[in-house]
Protein backbone atom coordinates (compact mmCIF):
# COMPACT_ATOMS: atom_id res chain seq x y z
CA UNK A 1 0.00 0.00 0.00
CA UNK A 2 3.04 2.25 0.20
CA UNK A 3 2.63 2.57 -3.57
CA UNK A 4 -0.69 4.38 -3.03
CA UNK A 5 1.00 6.93 -0.76
CA UNK A 6 3.68 7.48 -3.43
CA UNK A 7 0.96 7.99 -6.05
CA UNK A 8 -0.75 10.53 -3.79
CA UNK A 9 2.52 12.45 -3.33
CA UNK A 10 3.04 12.44 -7.10
CA UNK A 11 -0.48 13.83 -7.62
CA UNK A 12 0.31 16.64 -5.17
CA UNK A 13 3.59 17.44 -6.91
CA UNK A 14 1.74 17.81 -10.25
CA UNK A 15 -0.81 20.31 -8.84
CA UNK A 16 1.05 23.39 -10.05
CA UNK A 17 2.24 21.99 -13.39
CA UNK A 18 -0.39 19.54 -14.68
CA UNK A 19 -3.76 19.63 -12.92
CA UNK A 20 -5.41 17.16 -15.30
CA UNK A 21 -2.74 14.52 -14.64
CA UNK A 22 -3.12 15.12 -10.90
CA UNK A 23 -6.91 14.67 -11.19
CA UNK A 24 -6.45 11.40 -13.12
CA UNK A 25 -4.10 9.97 -10.46
CA UNK A 26 -6.45 10.97 -7.63
CA UNK A 27 -9.41 9.46 -9.51
CA UNK A 28 -7.50 6.16 -9.74
CA UNK A 29 -6.75 6.17 -5.98
CA UNK A 30 -10.37 6.99 -5.07
CA UNK A 31 -11.78 4.21 -7.30
CA UNK A 32 -9.44 1.61 -5.82
CA UNK A 33 -10.96 -0.63 -3.12
CA UNK A 34 -9.12 -0.74 0.22
CA UNK A 35 -9.26 -3.12 3.18
CA UNK A 36 -10.94 -1.67 6.30
CA UNK A 37 -8.03 -2.85 8.49
CA UNK A 38 -5.38 -1.17 6.30
CA UNK A 39 -5.19 2.16 8.16
CA UNK A 40 -2.55 3.69 5.86
CA UNK A 41 -4.57 2.93 2.70
CA UNK A 42 -7.78 4.27 4.28
CA UNK A 43 -5.98 7.48 5.35
CA UNK A 44 -4.49 8.04 1.87
CA UNK A 45 -7.86 7.42 0.20
CA UNK A 46 -9.52 9.91 2.58
CA UNK A 47 -6.89 12.57 1.75
CA UNK A 48 -7.22 11.79 -1.97
CA UNK A 49 -11.00 12.31 -1.86
CA UNK A 50 -10.59 15.74 -0.24
CA UNK A 51 -7.78 16.72 -2.61
CA UNK A 52 -9.78 15.58 -5.66
CA UNK A 53 -12.86 17.44 -4.44
CA UNK A 54 -10.84 20.64 -4.06
CA UNK A 55 -9.38 20.27 -7.57
CA UNK A 56 -12.78 19.61 -9.16
CA UNK A 57 -14.17 22.69 -7.39
CA UNK A 58 -11.26 24.88 -8.55
CA UNK A 59 -11.61 23.71 -12.16
CA UNK A 60 -15.39 24.25 -12.15
CA UNK A 61 -16.33 20.58 -12.65
CA UNK A 62 -19.58 20.73 -10.65
CA UNK A 63 -21.19 17.58 -12.10
CA UNK A 64 -18.06 15.49 -11.38
CA UNK A 65 -17.88 16.83 -7.82
CA UNK A 66 -21.55 15.95 -7.25
CA UNK A 67 -20.85 12.47 -8.61
CA UNK A 68 -17.84 12.09 -6.29
CA UNK A 69 -20.00 12.94 -3.28
CA UNK A 70 -22.37 10.07 -4.15
CA UNK A 71 -19.58 7.64 -5.16
CA UNK A 72 -17.68 7.79 -1.83
CA UNK A 73 -20.68 6.84 0.37
CA UNK A 74 -19.76 3.11 0.67
CA UNK A 75 -16.21 4.12 1.73
CA UNK A 76 -17.57 6.26 4.60
CA UNK A 77 -18.37 3.09 6.56
CA UNK A 78 -14.61 2.36 6.67
CA UNK A 79 -13.83 5.50 8.70
CA UNK A 80 -15.11 6.93 11.98
CA UNK A 81 -18.43 8.78 12.03
CA UNK A 82 -16.67 12.07 12.88
CA UNK A 83 -14.29 11.73 9.91
CA UNK A 84 -17.14 10.68 7.61
CA UNK A 85 -19.18 13.71 8.68
CA UNK A 86 -16.20 16.03 8.07
CA UNK A 87 -15.62 14.48 4.63
CA UNK A 88 -19.27 14.81 3.53
CA UNK A 89 -19.55 18.38 4.84
CA UNK A 90 -16.28 19.40 3.18
CA UNK A 91 -17.28 17.97 -0.22
CA UNK A 92 -20.78 19.45 0.00
CA UNK A 93 -19.37 22.87 0.99
CA UNK A 94 -16.99 22.73 -1.98
CA UNK A 95 -19.92 21.92 -4.28
CA UNK A 96 -22.23 24.62 -2.88
CA UNK A 97 -19.51 27.30 -2.81
CA UNK A 98 -18.76 26.87 -6.51
CA UNK A 99 -19.65 29.88 -8.67
CA UNK A 100 -20.75 27.62 -11.56
CA UNK A 101 -24.23 26.80 -10.23
CA UNK A 102 -25.82 23.67 -11.69
CA UNK A 103 -29.35 24.03 -10.29
CA UNK A 104 -28.88 20.67 -8.54
CA UNK A 105 -27.65 22.15 -5.24
CA UNK A 106 -30.87 21.69 -3.23
CA UNK A 107 -31.49 18.22 -4.71
CA UNK A 108 -27.97 17.03 -3.83
CA UNK A 109 -28.24 18.47 -0.33
CA UNK A 110 -31.57 16.69 0.22
CA UNK A 111 -30.04 13.41 -1.06
CA UNK A 112 -27.19 13.71 1.45
CA UNK A 113 -29.68 14.40 4.27
CA UNK A 114 -31.72 11.30 3.33
CA UNK A 115 -28.51 9.23 3.29
CA UNK A 116 -27.55 10.54 6.76
CA UNK A 117 -31.05 9.66 8.04
CA UNK A 118 -30.86 6.12 6.63
CA UNK A 119 -27.42 5.66 8.23
CA UNK A 120 -28.76 7.10 11.53
CA UNK A 121 -26.04 9.77 11.58
CA UNK A 122 -27.91 12.41 13.60
CA UNK A 123 -25.12 15.00 13.98
CA UNK A 124 -24.27 14.85 10.29
CA UNK A 125 -27.95 15.14 9.35
CA UNK A 126 -28.30 18.25 11.53
CA UNK A 127 -25.19 19.84 10.01
CA UNK A 128 -26.47 19.11 6.49
CA UNK A 129 -29.92 20.51 7.31
CA UNK A 130 -28.26 23.70 8.59
CA UNK A 131 -26.41 23.90 5.26
CA UNK A 132 -29.73 23.43 3.46
CA UNK A 133 -31.22 26.36 5.44
CA UNK A 134 -28.26 28.45 4.24
CA UNK A 135 -28.90 27.28 0.68
CA UNK A 136 -32.59 28.19 0.91
CA UNK A 137 -31.54 31.65 2.13
CA UNK A 138 -29.05 32.10 -0.73
CA UNK A 139 -31.71 31.13 -3.29
CA UNK A 140 -34.28 33.51 -1.67
CA UNK A 141 -36.57 30.65 -0.54
CA UNK A 142 -37.10 32.42 2.77
CA UNK A 143 -40.25 30.66 4.01
CA UNK A 144 -38.65 27.23 3.51
CA UNK A 145 -35.52 28.48 5.30
CA UNK A 146 -37.59 29.64 8.30
CA UNK A 147 -39.67 26.46 8.40
CA UNK A 148 -36.70 24.05 8.37
CA UNK A 149 -34.65 26.38 10.59
CA UNK A 150 -37.39 26.53 13.23
CA UNK A 151 -37.62 22.71 13.43
CA UNK A 152 -33.85 22.35 13.64
CA UNK A 153 -33.52 25.07 16.31
CA UNK A 154 -35.93 23.21 18.61
CA UNK A 155 -33.84 20.06 18.15
CA UNK A 156 -30.46 21.75 18.67
CA UNK A 157 -31.53 23.55 21.86
CA UNK A 158 -31.93 20.13 23.50
CA UNK A 159 -28.41 19.10 22.45
CA UNK A 160 -24.95 20.51 23.09
CA UNK A 161 -23.87 21.57 19.58
CA UNK A 162 -23.69 25.30 20.33
CA UNK A 163 -21.53 26.16 17.29
CA UNK A 164 -24.22 24.83 14.93
CA UNK A 165 -26.89 26.57 17.03
CA UNK A 166 -25.10 29.92 16.56
CA UNK A 167 -24.89 29.35 12.79
CA UNK A 168 -28.61 28.60 12.63
CA UNK A 169 -29.65 31.57 14.80
CA UNK A 170 -27.50 33.81 12.60
CA UNK A 171 -29.19 32.42 9.47
CA UNK A 172 -32.58 33.04 11.08
CA UNK A 173 -31.59 36.68 11.69
CA UNK A 174 -30.47 37.10 8.07
CA UNK A 175 -33.71 35.58 6.77
CA UNK A 176 -35.93 37.83 8.90
CA UNK A 177 -33.86 40.84 7.80
CA UNK A 178 -34.35 39.86 4.15
CA UNK A 179 -38.11 39.73 4.85
CA UNK A 180 -37.87 43.23 6.47
CA UNK A 181 -38.93 41.86 9.87
CA UNK A 182 -36.33 43.84 11.83
CA UNK A 183 -37.57 43.13 15.41
CA UNK A 184 -37.33 39.34 14.83
CA UNK A 185 -33.99 39.75 13.00
CA UNK A 186 -32.59 41.63 16.01
CA UNK A 187 -34.00 39.05 18.48
CA UNK A 188 -32.43 36.14 16.54
CA UNK A 189 -29.09 37.97 16.37
CA UNK A 190 -29.16 38.65 20.13
CA UNK A 191 -29.77 34.91 20.73
CA UNK A 192 -26.86 34.03 18.41
CA UNK A 193 -24.46 36.42 20.20
CA UNK A 194 -25.58 35.13 23.63
CA UNK A 195 -24.96 31.52 22.57
CA UNK A 196 -21.62 32.50 20.97
CA UNK A 197 -20.40 34.03 24.26
CA UNK A 198 -20.48 30.57 25.87
CA UNK A 199 -18.18 28.90 23.30
CA UNK A 200 -15.06 29.50 21.24
CA UNK A 201 -16.18 31.09 17.98
CA UNK A 202 -14.05 30.38 14.87
CA UNK A 203 -12.92 33.62 13.12
CA UNK A 204 -15.28 33.02 10.18
CA UNK A 205 -18.35 32.67 12.43
CA UNK A 206 -17.34 35.63 14.63
CA UNK A 207 -16.86 37.79 11.52
CA UNK A 208 -20.31 36.73 10.25
CA UNK A 209 -21.86 37.74 13.60
CA UNK A 210 -20.13 41.14 13.47
CA UNK A 211 -21.25 41.64 9.87
CA UNK A 212 -24.90 40.92 10.72
CA UNK A 213 -24.69 43.19 13.79
CA UNK A 214 -23.49 46.03 11.57
CA UNK A 215 -26.28 45.40 9.04
CA UNK A 216 -28.97 45.42 11.77
CA UNK A 217 -27.60 48.63 13.36
CA UNK A 218 -27.54 50.32 9.95
CA UNK A 219 -31.02 49.12 8.96
CA UNK A 220 -32.94 49.52 12.20
CA UNK A 221 -31.33 52.37 14.10
CA UNK A 222 -29.42 54.21 11.37
CA UNK A 223 -26.56 54.08 13.89
CA UNK A 224 -23.79 54.32 11.33
CA UNK A 225 -20.94 54.80 13.84
CA UNK A 226 -21.73 51.56 15.67
CA UNK A 227 -22.37 49.80 12.34
CA UNK A 228 -18.93 50.95 11.12
CA UNK A 229 -17.26 49.45 14.22
CA UNK A 230 -18.94 46.09 13.61
CA UNK A 231 -18.07 46.12 9.89
CA UNK A 232 -14.44 46.91 10.77
CA UNK A 233 -14.32 43.92 13.16
CA UNK A 234 -15.90 41.73 10.45
CA UNK A 235 -13.39 42.99 7.86
CA UNK A 236 -10.42 42.17 10.11
CA UNK A 237 -11.87 38.71 10.84
CA UNK A 238 -12.48 37.84 7.19
CA UNK A 239 -9.12 39.33 6.16
CA UNK A 240 -7.29 37.13 8.70
CA UNK A 241 -8.65 33.96 7.01
CA UNK A 242 -8.42 35.33 3.43
CA UNK A 243 -12.20 35.11 2.99
CA UNK A 244 -13.77 36.69 -0.13
CA UNK A 245 -16.35 38.22 2.26
CA UNK A 246 -13.68 40.71 3.41
CA UNK A 247 -14.31 42.93 0.38
CA UNK A 248 -18.05 43.04 1.24
CA UNK A 249 -17.26 44.16 4.81
CA UNK A 250 -14.92 46.83 3.38
CA UNK A 251 -17.67 48.07 1.04
CA UNK A 252 -20.06 48.38 4.00
CA UNK A 253 -17.39 50.35 5.91
CA UNK A 254 -17.14 52.78 2.99
CA UNK A 255 -20.95 53.00 2.84
CA UNK A 256 -21.02 53.98 6.53
CA UNK A 257 -18.58 56.83 5.89
CA UNK A 258 -20.76 58.09 3.01
CA UNK A 259 -23.94 57.91 5.14
CA UNK A 260 -22.14 59.73 7.98
CA UNK A 261 -21.47 62.64 5.56
CA UNK A 262 -17.73 61.92 5.72
CA UNK A 263 -17.06 61.09 2.04
CA UNK A 264 -13.52 62.45 2.36
CA UNK A 265 -12.68 59.49 4.67
CA UNK A 266 -13.44 57.02 1.87
CA UNK A 267 -10.21 57.72 -0.04
CA UNK A 268 -8.04 57.42 3.09
CA UNK A 269 -9.72 54.09 3.93
CA UNK A 270 -9.19 52.67 0.43
CA UNK A 271 -5.53 53.68 0.36
CA UNK A 272 -4.92 52.34 3.90
CA UNK A 273 -2.46 49.48 4.40
CA UNK A 274 -5.12 46.89 5.30
CA UNK A 275 -7.52 47.72 2.44
CA UNK A 276 -4.95 48.33 -0.31
CA UNK A 277 -4.95 44.69 -1.45
CA UNK A 278 -8.71 44.89 -2.10
CA UNK A 279 -8.50 47.85 -4.49
CA UNK A 280 -10.59 47.31 -7.63
CA UNK A 281 -14.02 47.95 -9.11
CA UNK A 282 -15.80 47.17 -5.84
CA UNK A 283 -14.03 49.95 -3.92
CA UNK A 284 -13.91 52.26 -6.96
CA UNK A 285 -17.73 52.14 -7.13
CA UNK A 286 -18.10 53.44 -3.56
CA UNK A 287 -15.37 56.02 -4.19
CA UNK A 288 -17.42 57.46 -7.10
CA UNK A 289 -20.57 57.55 -4.94
CA UNK A 290 -18.62 59.33 -2.18
CA UNK A 291 -17.38 61.94 -4.65
CA UNK A 292 -20.92 62.49 -5.99
CA UNK A 293 -22.22 62.83 -2.42
CA UNK A 294 -19.47 65.32 -1.56
CA UNK A 295 -20.28 67.44 -4.64
CA UNK A 296 -24.07 67.04 -4.10
CA UNK A 297 -24.22 66.05 -7.77
CA UNK A 298 -27.21 63.97 -8.88
CA UNK A 299 -25.71 63.53 -12.35
CA UNK A 300 -22.49 62.03 -10.92
CA UNK A 301 -24.56 59.85 -8.57
CA UNK A 302 -26.62 58.43 -11.45
CA UNK A 303 -23.48 57.95 -13.54
CA UNK A 304 -21.90 55.90 -10.73
CA UNK A 305 -25.06 53.78 -10.34
CA UNK A 306 -25.11 53.08 -14.09
CA UNK A 307 -21.37 52.48 -14.51
CA UNK A 308 -21.07 50.22 -11.43
CA UNK A 309 -24.50 48.57 -11.54
CA UNK A 310 -23.27 45.08 -10.57
CA UNK A 311 -21.20 46.42 -7.66
CA UNK A 312 -23.91 48.73 -6.26
CA UNK A 313 -27.36 47.54 -7.33
CA UNK A 314 -26.80 43.77 -6.99
CA UNK A 315 -25.98 44.07 -3.27
CA UNK A 316 -29.35 44.53 -1.48
CA UNK A 317 -27.79 46.22 1.57
CA UNK A 318 -25.88 48.83 -0.45
CA UNK A 319 -28.72 49.28 -2.93
CA UNK A 320 -31.29 50.01 -0.18
CA UNK A 321 -29.18 52.63 1.58
CA UNK A 322 -27.97 54.27 -1.64
CA UNK A 323 -31.62 54.64 -2.74
CA UNK A 324 -32.29 56.54 0.50
CA UNK A 325 -29.14 58.62 0.02
CA UNK A 326 -30.19 59.45 -3.56
CA UNK A 327 -33.65 60.52 -2.33
CA UNK A 328 -32.10 62.79 0.32
CA UNK A 329 -29.73 64.28 -2.25
CA UNK A 330 -32.61 64.86 -4.67
CA UNK A 331 -34.67 66.57 -1.96
CA UNK A 332 -31.77 68.84 -0.98
CA UNK A 333 -31.22 69.78 -4.64
CA UNK A 334 -34.92 70.50 -5.21
CA UNK A 335 -35.24 72.66 -2.08
CA UNK A 336 -32.12 74.61 -3.10
CA UNK A 337 -33.53 75.16 -6.63
CA UNK A 338 -37.05 76.25 -5.59
CA UNK A 339 -35.93 78.40 -2.63
CA UNK A 340 -35.75 81.73 -4.58
CA UNK A 341 -39.17 81.23 -6.23
CA UNK A 342 -42.79 81.64 -5.21
CA UNK A 343 -43.98 80.34 -8.61
CA UNK A 344 -41.78 78.33 -10.99
CA UNK A 345 -42.29 76.11 -14.03
CA UNK A 346 -41.68 72.40 -13.41
CA UNK A 347 -39.96 72.24 -16.81
CA UNK A 348 -37.44 74.84 -15.58
CA UNK A 349 -36.73 72.83 -12.39
CA UNK A 350 -36.18 69.62 -14.41
CA UNK A 351 -33.70 71.45 -16.68
CA UNK A 352 -31.78 72.81 -13.69
CA UNK A 353 -31.33 69.44 -11.98
CA UNK A 354 -31.18 67.42 -15.24
CA UNK A 355 -34.05 65.03 -14.49
CA UNK A 356 -37.20 64.21 -16.46
CA UNK A 357 -40.29 66.35 -15.83
CA UNK A 358 -42.28 63.29 -14.65
CA UNK A 359 -39.64 62.34 -12.04
CA UNK A 360 -39.48 65.92 -10.74
CA UNK A 361 -43.28 66.15 -10.55
CA UNK A 362 -43.54 62.87 -8.61
CA UNK A 363 -40.83 63.88 -6.14
CA UNK A 364 -42.31 67.36 -5.56
CA UNK A 365 -45.74 65.79 -4.89
CA UNK A 366 -44.19 63.43 -2.36
CA UNK A 367 -42.29 66.28 -0.65
CA UNK A 368 -45.48 68.38 -0.38
CA UNK A 369 -47.34 65.42 1.17
CA UNK A 370 -44.43 64.84 3.59
CA UNK A 371 -44.55 68.59 4.45
CA UNK A 372 -40.91 69.13 3.43
CA UNK A 373 -42.15 72.49 2.10
CA UNK A 374 -45.53 74.18 1.65
CA UNK A 375 -46.94 74.54 -1.84
CA UNK A 376 -49.17 73.11 -4.57
CA UNK A 377 -48.62 71.68 -8.06
CA UNK A 378 -50.75 73.30 -10.77
CA UNK A 379 -50.53 70.54 -13.39
CA UNK A 380 -52.76 72.43 -15.83
CA UNK A 381 -50.26 75.30 -15.96
CA UNK A 382 -47.27 73.01 -15.31
CA UNK A 383 -46.05 75.16 -12.41
CA UNK A 384 -45.15 74.78 -8.75
CA UNK A 385 -46.57 77.44 -6.43
CA UNK A 386 -44.56 77.77 -3.20
CA UNK A 387 -46.14 79.23 -0.06
CA UNK A 388 -44.40 80.95 2.84
CA UNK A 389 -43.91 78.88 5.96
CA UNK A 390 -47.11 79.31 8.04
CA UNK A 391 -46.50 80.84 11.49
CA UNK A 392 -46.30 78.19 14.19
CA UNK A 393 -49.32 78.29 16.49
CA UNK A 394 -47.89 78.39 20.01
CA UNK A 395 -51.26 78.14 21.81
CA UNK A 396 -50.68 74.47 22.63
CA UNK A 397 -47.22 75.08 24.15
CA UNK A 398 -48.52 78.10 26.11
CA UNK A 399 -51.45 76.05 27.46
CA UNK A 400 -49.11 73.28 28.60
CA UNK A 401 -46.83 75.79 30.33
CA UNK A 402 -49.82 77.42 32.13
CA UNK A 403 -51.13 74.03 33.32
CA UNK A 404 -47.63 73.11 34.52
CA UNK A 405 -47.30 76.36 36.52
CA UNK A 406 -50.81 75.93 37.99
CA UNK A 407 -49.88 72.39 39.02
CA UNK A 408 -46.83 73.72 40.88
CA UNK A 409 -48.96 76.37 42.67
CA UNK A 410 -51.58 73.78 43.72
CA UNK A 411 -48.83 71.45 45.01
CA UNK A 412 -47.28 74.32 46.97
CA UNK A 413 -50.64 75.32 48.53
CA UNK A 414 -51.33 71.67 49.40
CA UNK A 415 -47.97 71.36 51.20
CA UNK A 416 -48.62 74.58 53.19
CA UNK A 417 -52.12 73.43 54.17
CA UNK A 418 -50.66 70.10 55.27
CA UNK A 419 -48.19 71.85 57.60
CA UNK A 420 -51.01 73.90 59.21
CA UNK A 421 -52.99 70.77 60.03
UniProtKB/Swiss-Prot annotation:
The keyword Cytoplasm appears for this protein: yes
GO cellular component, one term: proteasome accessory complex
Primary subcellular site in the record, as a coarse category: nucleus
Positions of disulphide bridges: none
SUPFAM superfamilies named among the record's database cross-references: TPR-like, Winged helix' DNA-binding domain
One Pfam family here: PCI
Single GO molecular function: structural molecule activity
Highest taxon above the source species: Eukaryota
Compartments, record wording: Nucleus; Cytoplasm, Cytosol
A biological process from GO: proteasome assembly
Sorted UniProt keywords: Cytoplasm, Nucleus, Proteasome
Residues of the PCI domain: 227-391
Family: Belongs to the proteasome subunit S9 family.
Subunit architecture: Component of the lid subcomplex of the 19S proteasome regulatory particle complex (also named PA700 complex). The 26S proteasome consists of a 20S proteasome core and two 19S regulatory subunits.
Purpose of the protein: Component of the lid subcomplex of the 26S proteasome, a multiprotein complex involved in the ATP-dependent degradation of ubiquitinated proteins. In the complex, psmd11a is required for proteasome assembly.
Cross-referenced PANTHER family: 26S PROTEASOME NON-ATPASE REGULATORY SUBUNIT 11/COP9 SIGNALOSOME COMPLEX SUBUNIT 2
Name assigned to this protein: 26S proteasome non-ATPase regulatory subunit 11A
Lineage: Eukaryota, Metazoa, Chordata, Craniata, Vertebrata
GN (gene name): psmd11a
